[in-house]
């Protein structure tokens, strides 16, 4: 009789992980963590001094996860403090303020700082990164749109979420996906799962969208010199049209970039005899 009874499923073994937050001062790193861990929002800004440390427990599938969170100060003054905390990290919460373009532009510098501190033997490919486009509740002041932020994140194989520490929007979903990805990382021998490491578009497509977005005029948008001939304009247009056509390119912002290229070509050809 006992031999035919269903076996009780053994609970998954516990797991300890290290998570750090990165990003400029005042982007809301601490507020995001407090919103998730303490279910509250602190409206008064209190700058993080050096490092804030906290521990929380979560459950992913059948495993208990003990999360050690190191909330790192974003001010350059605290570099000598935070540079000791990059190593042995499984997950990074990379935060910028959608109303502060400089905080978005600084993301590359934060990655460079981490890479430098990990040294030649450090491998950032085996760390789960989640990008939080924070303060989306401040719609009037937004200057970094979703497609721009998502393009940057996904081109690097990072997770991307739109969040508001004030309202709580996107916070729980972000952390749940983040922790699941870290558990998958640990269960995959410390290697980032393929689904999280490869973008569904090319670097050439991502670079073209960024260039078009930041171009100063129609000539610059098509990548031709002012005064270019009709044939040169059409040749440049065809190359970009093939690269970015919405039917073949799924990169965030590709549809807007394609429309901008079409409009740029039309505007230039009107003035070329």
From Swiss-Prot:
Compartment(s) of residence: Nucleus
Region Required for interaction with MAPK1: start-end pairs: 1-18
InterPro entries linked to this entry: DnaJ_domain, J_dom_sf, P-loop_NTPase, Small_GTP-bd, Small_GTPase
Keyword Metal-binding: no
Tissue: Overexpressed in gastrointestinal cancers; expression correlates with later tumor-node-metastasis stages of colorectal cancers.
One Gene Ontology biological process: intracellular protein transport
Binding of GTP, residues: 23-30, 71-75, 134-137
Protein name: DnaJ homolog subfamily C member 27
Gene: DNAJC27
């Amino acid at each position: 009789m006992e031999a035919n009874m269903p076996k009780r499923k053994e609970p998954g073994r516990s797991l300890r992980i290290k998570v750090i937050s990165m990003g400029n001062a005042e982007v809301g790193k601490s507020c995001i963590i407090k919103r998730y861990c303490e279910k509250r929002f602190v409206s008064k800004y209190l700058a993080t001094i050096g490092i804030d440390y906290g521990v929380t427990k979560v459950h992913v599938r059948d495993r208990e996860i003990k999360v050690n969170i190191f909330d790192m100060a974003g001010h350059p003054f605290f570099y000598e403090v935070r540079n000791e905390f990059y190593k042995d990290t499984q997950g990074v919460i990379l935060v910028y303020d959608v109303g502060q373009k400089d905080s978005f532009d600084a993301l590359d510098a934060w990655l460079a700082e981490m890479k430098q501190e990990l040294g030649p033997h450090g491998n950032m490919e085996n760390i789960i990164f989640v990008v939080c486009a924070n303060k989306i509740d401040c719609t009037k002041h937004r200057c970094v749109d979703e497609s721009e932020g998502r393009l940057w994140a996904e081109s690097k194989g990072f997770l991307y979420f739109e969040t508001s520490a004030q309202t709580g929007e996107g916070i729980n979903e972000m952390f749940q996906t983040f922790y699941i990805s870290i558990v998958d990382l640990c269960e995959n021998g410390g290697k980032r799962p393929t689904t999280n490491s490869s973008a569904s578009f090319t670097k050439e497509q991502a670079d073209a969208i960024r260039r078009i977005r930041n171009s100063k005029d129609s000539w610059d948008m098509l990548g031709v010199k002012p005064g270019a001939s009709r044939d040169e304009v059409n040749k440049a247009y065809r190359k970009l049209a093939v690269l970015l056509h919405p039917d073949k390119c799924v990169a965030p912002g590709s549809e807007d970039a394609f429309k901008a290229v079409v409009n740029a070509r039309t505007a230039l050809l009107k003035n070329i005899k």
